[in-house]
Regions:
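C-terminal, low-ordered peptide segments at domain boundaries
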Residues: 1-84
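C-terminal "post-core" interaction segments
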Residues: 53-86, 95-317
Length: 317
């Protein structure tokens, strides 16, 4: 781990037909060892669409972690200041995280018109339910079933308040990500899905510390269901996309542009106002782009996402 390796670097370009990759050698480089923390927000930007007055916010969000909700709110503040008309939420690679962060994201999308409405409800087993456990997470309300969480209230100041969003999804999209889809649909916000059927994890976990054989173990058993304001929780087989396309086997284009196939479909949908009907020729990398940049709004900083689950804090009981 303390040494370095020599690797060959190649560049991938595309022939004029937009579908045939060309690999060009760029020589060798020495790659040394270093520490890297995967960011939760890979990209946030605002783009315009030629021939329209649309301003589209794009967020590539990789993991729900309460330690970085301030950065999430900062991204939406940039969206708000530029008066975005539409939102593309890219959750293709987001497999979950903290319930509270999911509620913050829901608040940032929904805004003041939905303040106080139920975003998500947690349901435990019969014994814990009879004991009064379980409860609601509400839009813009800091009091939750877990604890008081100030960012839920603060998020209203940065919310974009949209009635319709576009979400890019895959089989990896799970748990807290699916909670966003389900929670917003429970508020009758239109959530249009593009990609693959999601993972189908409609349950959550809690951290519990236990001692065995003089060792401490932190366990995360599945302990609760997550449902929306309408009581819907039956998505164990995943959410089926409105436009189904598998981009997992291709080399991705630049995120948030027409070079990314799922992003392309979302932008075409936003521009036309109609769900695209896919044809083979429409999924190549050639042709003109109806999109123009509306600013270079990258927000990349080393942060650590909590992935793989809908999670609540650990207990030592």
């Amino acid at each position: 781990y303390d040494g370095s390796v020599e690797i060959a670097v190649s560049q991938v370009t595309w022939e004029d037909n937009g579908s045939t990759p060309v690999l060009s050698s760029k020589g060798n480089i020495q790659l040394g060892a270093a520490s890297f923390t995967d960011p939760a927000i890979y990209m946030d930007k605002v783009v315009g669409i030629d021939g329209t007055d649309k301003k589209v916010g794009y967020l590539l969000y990789m993991g729900f972690n309460i330690d970085y909700d301030d950065e999430l709110m900062a991204a939406f503040e940039r969206f708000r200041q530029q008066n975005v008309t539409d939102l593309i939420l890219d959750l293709r690679y987001n497999n979950g995280g903290d319930v509270l962060s999911s509620a913050v994201l829901g608040t940032l999308v929904a805004g003041n018109d939905y303040k106080g409405q139920v975003y998500a409800h947690t349901t435990f087993n019969e014994d814990r339910t009879e004991a009064g456990e379980g409860g609601d997470y509400k839009i813009g309300v800091k009091e939750t079933v877990e604890r008081i969480y100030e960012p839920l209230e603060t998020a209203l100041q940065h919310a974009v308040g949209l009635k319709k969003i576009y979400v890019l999804v895959s089989q990896t999209t799970a748990s807290a990500s699916e909670m966003v889809i389900n929670g917003l649909r429970g508020l009758d916000i239109e959530v249009n899905l593009i990609g693959q059927t999601t993972n189908g994890k409609n349950v959550g976990m809690e951290g519990v510390m236990r001692s065995f054989y003089n060792h401490e173990f932190l366990l995360y058993p599945v302990t609760f269901y997550v449902e929306n304001a309408k009581g819907f929780r039956d998505y164990s087989t995943g959410f089926v996309p409105d436009v189904e396309i598998d981009d997992s086997a291709i080399y991705p284009g630049e995120f948030g542009t027409m070079e990314d196939q799922l992003g392309y479909i979302a932008l075409v949908w936003i521009k036309s106002g109609k769900k695209p009907e896919l044809q083979a020729s429409s999924l190549t990398r050639g042709g003109g782009s109806p999109m123009k940049p509306f600013g270079d709004l990258w927000d990349i900083r080393p942060i650590r996402p909590m992935g793989g689950a809908v999670m609540r804090p650990r207990t030592d009981e």
